[in-house]
Amino acid sequence: NVVVVDGDMRRPKLAQYLGAVGSVGFSNVLSGGATLDDAIQATRFPRLSVLTSGAVPPNPSELLASQAAKKVLSDLKARFDYVIVDSSPLLAVTDAAIIAASSDGVLVMTRFGSTKREQLAHAIKSLEDVGAPVLGSVFTMTPARGASSYSYNYGYYGEGEAGKPEVSTTSPVSGRRRADRRKQEVSGSE
């Protein structure tokens, strides 16, 4: 069983994406306006529940940093096999780092053609600064290459020269590998 929590209390979207009622959710539970049982909703997908963001509060960071938030997340971990929290953008506000600090792991979502290497490095450093374990990064919005080709990327995060963050990846594959593009530093030098 999996529960997805909309931790983006500034621009919540999960209710819309999953066809759920968004008026009562995480913010309401944290502020004492609803119980967790009242706020968790089933979705059309088997074994997937959602805790929508709820009413947009005036103080999202305070709510997310509260003991109530830690208790709710702990209660969810006891009820579900997996708890996935979708948060606000990491570099825009502190909300994501607050949630990440008490998580078992973080996947950093990066948008192809939009997220700069420096931004990714800064985001990872922000997570490390709060002690959040970075499990990896997911590259979204990658362009389609056509029906006759395929591509994939994989990589790992580590330390490069002089302690600089480094991301190692393979290049998109379309028939053959390009070994000369395997390693690229997050700092932008190639």
Where are these regions (language model features)?
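P-loop NTP-binding module
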Residues: 1-190
